[in-house]
Structures are given as structure tokens and as C-alpha cells.
Amino acid sequence: HKTVAAIRELLAVNMPSGSLGRLAERGFRPATVLDIGAYDGEWTRSVKALFPAARFVMVEALAGKKEELRWVAEAFPGGQVEVLIALLGAEQRQRVPFHVMETGSSVYEEQTTFPRQAVELPMTRLDRLLTEIAAPALMKIDVQGSELDVLAGAGALVEAVEVLILECAILGYNKGAPQLTEVLVRLEEAGFLPYDIADLTRGLGGILFHFDMVFVRKGSPLRPEGMLW
């Protein structure tokens, strides 16, 4: 029983909901949750249980996922969950190359052997897609290397964000995409500091190549200072 309990505890620590659960315990109650790179909506489904009163917006680049995401949204009545189909980036562009894969679709092509299809999609900025978001906001960006581009395209909307979750790479998994060191610098410049890590992904030989990092705004009471133990 102790072994099972230890495994469950380890899984809770490594899952994004574990990080957010700890933030909830510290009093974090977002008014808005942005799920950028929503894919099948599973992240929104699980996090909605943590923050039932929040308005959720799922943004996904692949139009083929719209119906699946709509089913997720309809499970929460009252218009609390919205679905938007859009490829987000740092600028407005009529056409950009996009590599369609089962779970790793991206502007930045994966350096893997998994099958993909090259297409072109229009790109927009988040601050063109949404005019405002209620604070405090939680923003999760999981877009296979385009995280900083999406953040740049958020413009003044970032001012409402208290907690950010970004997929961060420590190896060149997506060709030309920023790696962890650049992400940390850019996020500090934007006013955010690391809080937690979750969802570690390993490749051949157990090599860690990316994980989700949770950031909170500088000076936030969510990030403790002083005596920690």
C-alpha cells in the first residue's frame, strides 16, 4: 500500500493539475483560463474541475479538432467554455507553413521520424482574437515551440495574467524553436518567474527533452519568499 501511495504522490507532483492544485491551495482563483494549443480539450476538462467558476477559452490551430472541442465545451453549460480555431503567433500573416502531426503539429518542424503533412494556415495574434480577458488569468501555452511567439502576440492581454504554463524544451526537439535558457530570460523580462515544473517528456534512452514550466508574476503572493522550510 505504501508503494502504491508513493506512486500516486509522484504522479500528482508531475502532472500539471498537481501544480495547479498547489496554486489553488494557496488561494489562486482565476477568472479566465486560456488553453492555447487545446488539441483534444483534455487539459481544459481536468483543470475545469479545479476552477469551476472560471471562464475557459480553448484555442486550437487545427480545424479538424473543432467538433471534439465543442463536445468538451458542451459538457459545461452556461457558455463557460469557448472554442476558437486559430493559429496564433507574434504577427498577422495570411499564410504560414504549418506541419500537421497527430499530437505535435507546429510552425516549427519536429526533428523526429513521425509522419507529418505540410500545409499553410493563416496566423493571427491573440490580442486580435480576444479584445480583453478578466483578471486574474491563467494562460497555458503548449504549441510545440511557438510559445514565445504566442506570448508576444498577446500584447497588453498579458497584463491580466497571473500564472503562465509553457512547454519548455531543453533539446532541439522543434527545429529553430527557442530552448529553455531563452524562455527563462524572455519570461523574466515579461515579469514572470518560475514556480514549478510538470509533465516531463523523455525520448530515446530516457533523455529529457521538454516539460511544462509554471510561471507566476513577480511579486505575487503565490510565489513564497523568505523562509521556505
Language-model segments: which ranges?
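Phosphate/nucleotide-binding beta-alpha loop and adjacent structural elements of enzyme active sites
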Residues: 1-229
